[in-house]
Swiss-Prot record:
Family membership: Belongs to the sugar phosphate cyclases superfamily. Dehydroquinate synthase family.
Known function: Catalyzes the conversion of 3-deoxy-D-arabino-heptulosonate 7-phosphate (DAHP) to dehydroquinate (DHQ).
Pathway connected to this protein: Metabolic intermediate biosynthesis; chorismate biosynthesis; chorismate from D-erythrose 4-phosphate and phosphoenolpyruvate: step 2/7
Cofactor(s) needed for function: Co(2+); Zn(2+); NAD(+)
Subcellular location: Cytoplasm
Binding of Zn(2+), residues: 188, 251, 267
Gene: aroB
Note on how the cofactor is bound: Binds 1 divalent metal cation per subunit. Can use either Co(2+) or Zn(2+).
Binding site for NAD(+): 75-80, 109-113, 133-134, 146, 155, 173-176
Gene Ontology biological-process annotations: amino acid biosynthetic process; aromatic amino acid family biosynthetic process; chorismate biosynthetic process
Protein known as: 3-dehydroquinate synthase
Domain of life: Bacteria
Reactions performed catalytically: 7-phospho-2-dehydro-3-deoxy-D-arabino-heptonate = 3-dehydroquinate + phosphate
Species: Pseudarthrobacter chlorophenolicus (strain ATCC 700700 / DSM 12829 / CIP 107037 / JCM 12360 / KCTC 9906 / NCIMB 13794 / A6)
A single cellular component GO annotation: cytoplasm
Length: 363
């Protein structure tokens, strides 16, 4: 087993926004060194399910001389609400956190989204370090500086761009991750393959079992490749003014499914259906070949991810898609493919086109 660490660099609009994503094993103990000497107080934000891990990180920081506290938040999307952010702000205020102090996020993508938002807004910005413990968190949410919380109107509608000081992707944390969470995270991995790195798709197709084995070198390579794709994109376009939109492949319908399901669906499962829909949409307008569209289905189904959704939910999905951040006026905008690793944008003024494409994924 590879015991060394891989460092993937993310560059920002200035040197102050540059940071490293470290992928390896046994990384939890490196946190004190990364925090540095100026930091005195650290708030460790973690979900209920990771109470023991959060306490371990806190104790390690205390042993290293920091004043460390924990803030336990609800699991998954339930933690991404303004009331939860307000609770974290209260903890920071009551313990006199200053701009030279720091927040550490320990958990999946929802935790890094929430913790990043709290860090971006407390005193207009304090240091945050992400320690993702899920596959989805490692390859997507923790990298790129996007933070956000949900509202009743949609997902991630309130947020800020706030790059982390570092990301520690400790592969040891995947050993106890439930298999369905690994499978969900693979949706974001193969997304990176479809939009930018065909080698990801080839690795998946070669051995479907290995890609969901937390101890396999195949999974590690997939994680590093997916992070590298995202790092390259966000280094060129931090604030989603153009290129970064391609990372939303599958997310327009995916976020709408999450909204309709009141976040009971896993993010990766929703994005999987969203990618299948985007492939059918691109096929219907002649931009994606039959072979590439069918490849979506075979890869996603091979991983155990869903590729269909309920036929009777179309109107709710359409309403949800109209709230998508990529929309411009009355135009719905979709990231589509003109081929593998050839992403583009499709503006759709006529919803009948969307309805027809949806029939190909409706069940």
């Amino acid at each position: 087993m590879n015991t060394s660490s891989t460092v993937i660099k993310v560059t920002g609009e200035s040197a102050a926004n540059n940071y490293d994503v470290v992928v390896g094993r046994g990384l939890l103990g490196t946190l004190p060194e990364i925090l540095g000497e100026r930091v005195r107080r650290v708030l460790v934000i973690h979900p209920r399910a990771l109470r023991l891990t959060g306490d371990t990180v806190r104790d390690d920081l205390e042993s290293a001389g920091f004043t460390a506290l924990t803030a336990e938040i609800p699991d998954a999307e339930e933690g991404k609400h303004i009331q939860v952010a307000a609770f974290c702000w209260q903890v920071l205020g009551q313990n006199d956190f200053t701009r030279s102090d720091a927040i550490v996020a320990v958990g999946g993508g929802a935790v890094t989204d929430l913790a990043g938002f709290v860090a971006a807004t407390w005193l207009r910005g304090v240091k945050v370090i992400h320690m993702p413990t899920s596959l989805l968190g490692m390859v997507d949410a923790s990298v790129g500086g996007k933070t956000g919380i949900n509202t009743a109107e949609g997902k991630n509608l309130v947020g800020a761009f706030h790059p982390p000081a570092a990301v520690l992707a400790d592969l040891d944390t995947l050993d106890t991750l439930p298999r369905n969470e690994l499978i969900s995270g693979m949706a974001e991995v193969v997304k990176c393959g479809f939009i930018a790195d065909p080698a990801i798709l080839e690795l998946v197709e070669k051995d479907f079992a290995a890609v969901t084995d937390p101890r396999s070198e195949t999974l590690r390579e997939l994680i590093e490749r997916a992070i590298a794709v995202k790092a390259k994109v966000v280094s060129e376009d931090l604030k989603e003014s153009g290129l970064r939109e391609i990372l939303n492949y599958g997310h327009t319908l995916g976020h709408a499914i999450e909204l309709v399901e009141r976040y009971s669906w896993r993010h990766g499962a929703a994005v999987s259906v969203g990618m299948m829909f985007a492939a059918e949409l691109a096929r219907s307008v002649g931009r994606l070949s039959d072979a590439d569209a069918d490849r979506h289905r075979s890869i996603l189904e091979g991983l155990g991810l869903p590729v269909t959704y309920r036929r009777d939910r179309w109107q709710g999905l359409l309403d949800g898609m109209r709230r998508d951040k990529k929309s411009r006026g009355d135009l719905l905008r979709f990231v589509v493919l003109d081929g593998v690793a050839k992403p583009g944008i499709l503006d759709v003024p006529d919803t009948s086109l969307l309805f027809a494409a949806y029939q190909e994924v409706a069940s």
